Amino acid sequence: MEYKFFLSESQMVLKAFYIESAMIAMLTGAKGNIVINGQSIEIESDVTLIIPKYSQVSCNIVCNTVKQPLELHTLSMSAEELQAVFLLLKTLMKSGAPLTSHQPIYHISPPETVRDNFSLLKQCLPLKKQSASQEALLMKQSLYFILMAIYQEGIDILNLFRFNYDEPKNQAITHLITQEPQKKWHLDDVAKALFTTPSTLRRHLNREGVSFRQLLLDVRMGMALNYLTFSNYSVFQISHRCGFGSNAYFCDVFKRKYNMTPSQFRLQSRQSNDPNFITNLSLRSNPIEFDKEIDE
């Protein structure tokens, strides 16, 4: 983890570059424009910036007033350092904010806690005795309070940083689909929700040994199996709730995959009274040849 402080009385212009570590920054006494991952941010007052790893950043800023220089505080951290703090924070946070928007929020007005902790780092670092372990502990403590303050301002930091540090991509996608199963999901939608590009996301899924279309079908089928077993919804209602294009299509794919109709599955599932029935059926399922209903 590394803290830096910059003081400037001149214009600060940076052409687009990629940062190699996640970063929290606070900019005071400045005005101008900052661009993070294509999102343009007009700076007119003090601002806190939340920048995930590998983000593309550029800026063109000047002092807000002639007599006062602009100040920039930055705290950068590795994936391991950020994850260690998240493990402490997760018990105090919800797993993720509802999907009201797929656009990341990279900036907020600095909460008082953020100002206080950056001020503390500026005053204390470097420590006079140059103890690396004590400096690391101080920065970790400040990062904890800074991230918590940002989260309390409504920024879903777990989701914002998730693409780089959290669960495997197939699990992240499963979480998105189960939140909105009726949405007609495409790879572009999921990539946008995870703040990445379709090509990068596809590479991650390839490394995890699964395609987007297969994952989408598996998630929807898994939900359908649970509805058939534990609810009294009709087959038509279940096909709609799980996001299939039509009841006929759902029944056709279900039969090809499990060698029985949804109604037959429901009957057998309830007659068997076996808690492992769904698991065993899934292990015996057939691969599906995709058609235009399930589209990337």
UniProtKB/Swiss-Prot annotation:
Domain of life: Bacteria
Residue spans binding DNA: 188-209, 235-258
InterPro entries the record matches: Homeodomain-like_sf, HTH_AraC, HTH_AraC-typ_CS, Tscrpt_reg_AraC-type_HTH
Transmembrane helix listed as a keyword: no
Record bears the keyword Ribosomal protein: no
Keywords for the protein's UniProt record, in alphabetical order: Activator, DNA-binding, Plasmid, Transcription, Transcription regulation
Cellular component, GO annotation: cytosol
Function: Positive regulator of the expression of the urease operon.
Protein name: Urease operon transcriptional activator
Gene name of the record: ureR
